[in-house]
Regions:
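A SIS-like phosphosugar-recognition module
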Residues: 1-194
Length: 194
C-alpha cells in the first residue's frame, strides 16, 4: 500500500540500512526499494478477502522466525514440527465442512458479531472480523479479550454471536473467564482452539 511504501522511503531517508520487505510480487515498488526481500510466492490473489495472501504472510513470518531463532542459537525444532503439521490440519478442516456449514447458519440473520483473542490469537481475531465484514457484509468488531468489560460486553445479549480464538497455553484461563461473562449475558459463543 502507499502507506507501507511511504514508511519504507522514510526509513531509507533516515539512513536505516537494514530493510526487509515481505512481499508476494517480486517486481513491486516495495521490493525494488527494500534492501532485502522475503518473497511469499503465493501467486496472484483472486479473493476479495485476501485469504491466501494472509495465510502466506503468517507462514512466511513463521519461517522467518525459525531462521532468526536458529541464528541466535535457539532451537527451532518445535516450530519446524508445527510447520510439518499444517498440511494435515488443513485436511482436517476440509473434513469439518459439514460442521462449519451448520455453524455458519447461526450468523445468517445477525447484524453484528464480536471477535475475541488474546496474545497471538488477537491479530487472528482482527483478521477474522475483517473477513466476515468483507464477505458477508455483517458488522464485526474484534477486541483483545481482556478489554471485553471496557465497553463491548455491554452490547452482548442472546442475539450477539461472540467468536473467540482460545489459545492452548497459559492465557486460556483468562480467556475462559471472559467467556463466562459473555455466557452470563446469554451471548452465543463460538470457540476456536488448537
Amino acid at each position: 500500500t502507499a502507506d507501507t511504501i511511504s514508511s519504507l522511503k522514510k526509513a531509507l531517508k533516515l539512513k536505516y540500512t537494514n530493510t526487509l520487505a515481505i512481499c508476494n510480487v517480486a517486481e513491486s515498488t516495495l521490493t525494488r526499494l527494500s534492501g532485502m526481500n522475503f518473497l511469499m510466492n503465493a501467486g496472484p490473489e483472486i479473493s476479495v478477502a485476501s485469504t491466501k495472501a494472509f495465510t502466506s504472510q503468517l507462514f512466511t513470518l513463521l519461517l522467518l522466525t525459525a531462521i532468526i531463532s536458529r541464528e541466535y542459537g535457539n532451537t527451532e525444532r518445535r516450530m519446524v514440527q508445527g510447520i510439518r503439521k499444517i498440511g494435515k490440519k488443513i485436511e482436517e478442516l476440509y473434513e469439518m465442512e459439514p460442521e462449519i456449514k451448520k455453524i455458519s447458519t447461526k450468523f445468517k440473520n445477525k447484524e453484528h458479531t464480536l471477535f475475541l483473542g488474546k496474545g497471538a490469537s488477537y491479530p487472528i481475531a482482527l483478521e477474522a472480523a475483517l473477513k466476515l465484514k468483507e464477505i458477508s457484509y455483517i458488522h464485526a468488531s474484534a477486541y483483545h479479550s481482556g478489554e471485553l468489560k471496557h465497553g463491548p460486553l455491554a452490547l452482548v445479549d442472546r442475539r450477539m454471536p461472540v467468536v473467540c480464538f482460545l489459545p492452548d497455553n497459559h492465557l486460556a484461563r483468562l480467556v475462559l473467564s471472559n467467556l463466562a461473562e459473555v455466557e452470563a449475558r446469554q451471548g452465543q459463543t463460538f470457540i476456536f482452539t488448537n
